[in-house]
Swiss-Prot record:
NCBIfam families xrefs: PPR
Organism of this sequence: Arabidopsis thaliana
InterPro entries: DYW_dom (IPR032867), E_motif (IPR046848), Pentatricopeptide_rpt (IPR002885), PPR_At4g14850-like_plant (IPR046960), TPR-like_helical_dom_sf (IPR011990)
Gene for this chain: DOT4
Stretch list, region Type E(+) motif: 746-776
Family annotation (Gene3D superfamilies): Tetratricopeptide repeat domain
Transit peptide location: 1-28
Region annotation Type DYW motif: where it falls in the sequence: 777-871
Cofactor(s) essential for the protein: Zn(2+)
Protein name: Pentatricopeptide repeat-containing protein DOT4, chloroplastic
GO BP, sorted A to Z: chloroplast RNA modification; cotyledon vascular tissue pattern formation; leaf development; leaf vascular tissue pattern formation; mRNA processing; phloem or xylem histogenesis
UniProt remark on cofactor binding: Binds 2 zinc ions per subunit.
A GO MF term: zinc ion binding
Phenotype seen when the gene is deleted: Defects in venation pattern in leaves and cotyledons.
Length: 871
């Protein structure tokens, strides 16, 4: 009391001067004192003042409530909560509690909010709709959505606003199912909904990709009479577009009685995002005609549409509109404009926009780097990346992946390594997107050791990481490593191989002729429904064709619902490899009748088929069709096919003259095709002339030296063989050893000439001796010229018995059941003696043998070969 008297005697309480002291009774009763003590803001600044005042005089409900509201109005949450906690239940009005809860919600103070909630529940307050609404709002704003939902379970909240807020916050936190569940509860509670309710819940259906749920919501909206509301219509348009239901979105848009700029922007952006840029741009034109004022979002979407459809003229017109509308200083405008020009191939305009930007961001640099990369200016892209730090702009993940993709595309290994060093220095190496891009760069540059190192150091891997490393090994001819990693992926069971994985590993099966493994993967594809992916289907057809199962390949080809050019080309190439030129031509004609235009690659496959089937006239005809009807300029590959075709059929001089008259300089591939023809037809003199041209073009290619040495050996010109082998040694070159492999019970067995490492060596040698004896009985004489050694005939015969393809075929026959097809692959051209023995083996054992060499397939059956001598 003494402290209070002291306070009252201070200058701030001058109302106690004599003019005011008229009624001592009123003063004693404390009515006026209480009134001025509670209401004077200047004096009572702390909760302790309020508590002293309230406890000193007769308390009334109005006292605490009024001061609490004062605290709430001034934002003094700390004192409001303290005062509330020392107040009794009967002092506080529920409306005051609502004010305090609102302050907690606005301040996002969960701790204070929980204290208020405890006060409410501890004092037995009835939580009605109003108080429950504020409680749920407090918990929602403070991020405790679980408690907010609990309040909704306990109390019937009647105002849609609070339902909408919680629904929206649940969706923002990623709990889309919870948001939809709250909407369903709102329906069952009979709460009157508003437009915002439907906008909130449609976003959740959209995020869950729940098309069926969204369609049901659409029906409910129409029944509820909200279908004509602009905001609801915009939400439905956005829902359908996000779920790729473009036609449904357009229908909603067309039925909207009132459209705003958001409506138009949504449908334009939706078309562009779903790969229908031209339709989006058409809507933009309608928007202009309708007199709707465009905004920055409109222009950004239109730039993206122009970029996708390469409509640079429209892009320039919109550029002018944007400048007039004063958008040219907006980052989004400049960045999308720059991207549009670079994607349309107008790099000069893109550079002009880039130079004029006053505030270049990392997005600007990334767009410019991607533009340089698209135009093949890889050096400029890398240079710009290196300049970024000089300008004080740190590249982000997107910039780094863009420049790595550029290095990968143009095989810039040294530049890629420099970027890798920068990544290490800036601790970006553990980002999964960067690591995947690094692996891809190294793999495409043929540096699989570095790619494997990046893969092994990754802390977190995803399926893209596995696909990149498996695909890298497969494309760089490390088929065994690709299959091993694929098996490891299956064993780990952390990720399931997807469409991309199987498309990456199937070429490895094809390379090894691993028919059984390929068939296992085929089963996996069918079980998981991946065959509908055209890339997978094409890879599967290619795998079976390269494993010698041409009939199965064609059956799968027929099953492809929508064949593209790759599908047809793969099958044509398959027939060509097997020597079925007429079938390849028939398929090519079928393709053209189906309205699919041939390209350079499909013509290479067709000309190859003609070459390996001896169809010279047809080969010339299609070569001319390609040039004159299809307007395709022949490349080195096309000319090489024609030279090979002429050389195989023995027209070596014509082939030589054809090369001399070519409009482009011949490379080693073309001269090499003629050199192979010289070997087939034993023309040593022309071979010497051709070989010098090949050696000049590719002096480090051992294969051509070996080919010429073999030509000399077959002609028994041993001195020339010695000189050539000495030349190889002087250059420090190494001969690529011939090897063959065969898959037995899921294991690939590899043989080199004279190999005795296989556990079945004794049985293999015994079988080959038996076959050779039977062949000699039937009048066969070993073709010892293919032994390629200067020795006695007996030694030559023994050398022939040790050829790798013979060893592989023998293992296949003695290790597999009767009737099983033998599939062997050799890295070099099969020799003539092995070819003859394979024919005899197929007849003797009544087994089909499929031998794939570096040139083509040989299918041996009943003593005959499918090549018919064209090999």
């Amino acid at each position: 009391m003494a402290m209070l008297v002291t306070n009252l005697s201070s200058s701030s309480f001058c109302f106690f001067s004599s003019p005011h002291l008229q009624n001592q009774k009123e003063i004693r009763s404390g009515v006026r004192v209480r009134k001025y003590v509670i209401f004077n803001r200047a004096s009572l600044r702390t909760v302790s003042d309020c508590v002293d005042s309230i406890t000193t005089f007769d308390r009334s409900v109005t006292d605490a409530n009024t001061q609490l509201r004062r605290f709430c109005e001034s934002g003094n949450l700390e004192n409001a909560v303290k005062l509330l906690c020392v107040s009794g239940k009967w002092d506080i009005d529920p409306r005051t509690l609502c004010s305090v809860l609102q302050l907690c919600a606005d301040s996002k103070s969960l701790k204070d909010g929980k204290e208020v909630d405890n006060f409410i529940r501890g004092n037995g307050f009835v939580i009605d709709s109003n108080l429950g609404s504020k409680l749920s709002l407090m918990y929602t704003n403070c991020g405790d959505l679980k408690e907010a939902s609990r309040v909704f379970d306990e109390v019937k909240i009647e105002k849609a606003l609070f339902w909408n807020i919680l629904m929206n916050e649940l969706a923002k936190s990623g709990d889309f199912s919870g948001s939809i569940g709250l909407f369903k509860k709102m329906m069952s509670s009979g709460v009157e909904m508003d437009s915002y309710t439907f906008s909130c819940v449609s976003k959740s259906f959209s995020s869950l990709r729940s098309v069926h749920g969204g369609e049901q919501l659409h029906g409910f909206i129409l029944k509820s009479g909200f279908g004509e509301r602009n905001s609801v219509g915009n939400s439905l348009v956005a829902f359908y577009l996000k779920n790729q239901r473009v036609d449904s979105a357009r229908k909603v848009f067309d039925e909207m009685t009132e459209r705003d700029v958001i409506s138009w922007n949504s449908i334009i952006n939706g078309y562009v995002s779903n790969g229908l840029a031209e339709k989006g741009l058409s809507v933009f034109v309608q928007m202009l005609v309708s007199g709707i004022e465009i905004d920055l979002a409109t222009i950004v979407s239109v730039f993206a549409g122009c970029a996708d459809s390469r409509l640079i003229s429209l892009g320039r017109a919109v550029h002018s509109i944007g400048v007039k509308a004063c958008f040219s200083r907006e980052d989004r405008f400049c960045n999308t404009l720059l991207d549009m020009y670079s994607k349309c191939g107008d790099l000069d305009s893109a550079k002009a926009v880039f130079r004029e930007m006053s505030d270049r961001s990392v997005v600007s640099y990334t767009s410019m780097i991607a533009g340089y990369a698209r135009e093949g200016l890889a050096g400029e892209a890398v240079k710009l990346f290196e300049e970024m730090e000089e300008e004080g702009i740190s590249p982000d993940v997107y910039t780094v992946t863009a420049v790595l993709n550029c290095c990968a595309r143009y095989r810039l290994l040294d530049e890629g390594k420099r970027v890798h060093e920068w990544i290490k220095e800036n601790d970006l190496g553990f980002d999964i997107f960067v690591s995947n891009a690094l692996m891809d760069m190294y793999a495409k540059c043929g540096s699989m050791q570095e790619a494997e190192l990046v893969f092994s150091e990754m802390r977190v891997k995803d399926i893209i990481s596995w696909n990149t490393i498996i695909g890298g090994y497969s494309k760089n001819c490390y088929a065994n490593e690709a299959l091993s990693l694929f098996n490891l992926l299956l064993e780990e069971k952390r990720f399931s191989p997807d469409e991309r994985t199987v498309a990456c590993v199937l070429p490895a099966c094809a390379s090894l002729s691993a028919f059984d493994k390929g068939r296992e993967i085929h089963g996996y594809i069918m079980r998981n429904g991946y065959f509908s992916d055209r890339h997978v289907a094409n890879s599967l057809v290619d795998m079976y064709a390269k494993c010698g199962a041409l009939l199965l390949a064609h059956m799968l080809f027929d099953d492809i619902a929508s064949k593209d050019l790759v599908s047809w080309t793969v099958m044509i190439a398959g027939y060509g490899m097997h020597g079925f030129g007429k079938e390849a031509i028939a398929l090519f004609n079928q393709m053209r009748q189906a309205g699919i235009e041939a390209d350079e690659i499909s013509f290479v496959s067709l000309l190859y088929a003609c070459s390996h089937s001896g169809l010279v006239d047809e080969g010339w005809r299609f070569f001319n069709i390609m040039r004159h009807e299809c307007k395709i300029e022949p490349t080195v590959e096309h000319y090489a096919c024609i030279v090979d075709m002429l050389a195989r059929t023995g027209d070596l001089i014509k082939a030589y003259r054809f090369i001399e008259n070519m409009p482009i300089p011949p490379d080693a591939t073309i001269w090499g095709a003629l050199l192979c023809g010289c070997r087939i037809h034993h023309d040593v003199k022309l071979a010497e002339k051709v070989a010098e041209k090949v050696f000049e073009l590719e002096p480090e290619n051992t294969g051509y030296y070996v080919l010429m040495a073999n030509i000399y050996a077959e002609a028994e010109k041993w001195e020339q063989v010695k000189r050539l082998r000495k030349r190889i040694g002087q250059r420090g070159l190494r001969k690529n050893p011939g090897c063959s492999w065969i898959e037995i019970k899921g294991r690939v067995n590899i043989f080199v000439a004279g190999d005795s490492s296989n556990p079945e060596t004794e049985n293999i040698e015994a079988f080959l001796r038996k076959v050779r004896a039977r062949m000699i009985e039937e009048g066969y004489s070993p073709l010892t010229k293919y032994a390629l050694i200067d020795a006695e005939e007996m030694e030559k015969e023994e050398a022939l018995c040790g050829h790798s393809e013979k060893l592989a075929m023998a293992l296949g026959i003695i290790s597999s059941g009767h009737g099983k097809i033998i599939r062997v692959t050799k890295n070099l051209r099969v020799c003539g003696d092995c070819h003859e023995m394979a024919k005899f083996m197929s007849k003797l054992t009544r087994r089909e043998i499929v031998l794939r060499d570096s040139n083509r397939f040989h299918q041996f059956k009943d003593g005959h070969c499918s090549c018919r001598g064209f090999w």
